[in-house]
């Protein structure tokens, strides 16, 4: 199964994270399929940069985000776009 999760980068005591698409059997910092953005929790306010189109595409393909990534993607507005796409597909099927 393909997951969307965080991989840790940065120095000791100064983490930042990449949001990546990875096979769930891989290590946390192992090889990944694609990078979707990054998250820096140390900055005030935190920095969140997500390629929304790529994230939507992977979610529609069936990639499961981890709970933390799900919260971050919700803040970035990814799930609103996913819902809109699903609604338009249902409307097209009904007509």
Curated annotation (Swiss-Prot):
Gene3D superfamilies, A to Z: 3.30.1320.10
GO biological process: translation
Entry-linked Pfam families: Ribosomal_S16 (PF00886)
MF annotations from Gene Ontology: structural constituent of ribosome
Lineage of producing organism: Bacteria, Thermotogati, Thermotogota, Thermotogae, Thermotogales
UniProt KW keywords: Ribonucleoprotein, Ribosomal protein
GO cellular component, one term: small ribosomal subunit
Superkingdom of source: Bacteria
Record's protein name: Small ribosomal subunit protein bS16
InterPro entries: Ribosomal_bS16, Ribosomal_bS16_CS, Ribosomal_bS16_dom_sf
Protein's UniProt keywords contain Mitochondrion: no
């Amino acid at each position: 199964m393909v997951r969307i999760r965080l991989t840790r980068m940065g120095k000791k005591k100064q983490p930042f994270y990449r949001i990546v698409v990875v096979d769930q059997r891989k290590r946390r910092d192992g090889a990944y399929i694609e990078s979707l953005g990054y998250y820096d929790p140390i900055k005030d306010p935190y920095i969140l940069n997500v390629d929304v189109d790529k994230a939507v595409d992977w979610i529609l393909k069936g990639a499961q985000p981890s709970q933390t990534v799900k919260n971050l993607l919700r803040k970035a507005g990814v799930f609103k776009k996913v819902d809109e796409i699903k609604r338009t597909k249902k409307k097209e099927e009904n007509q």
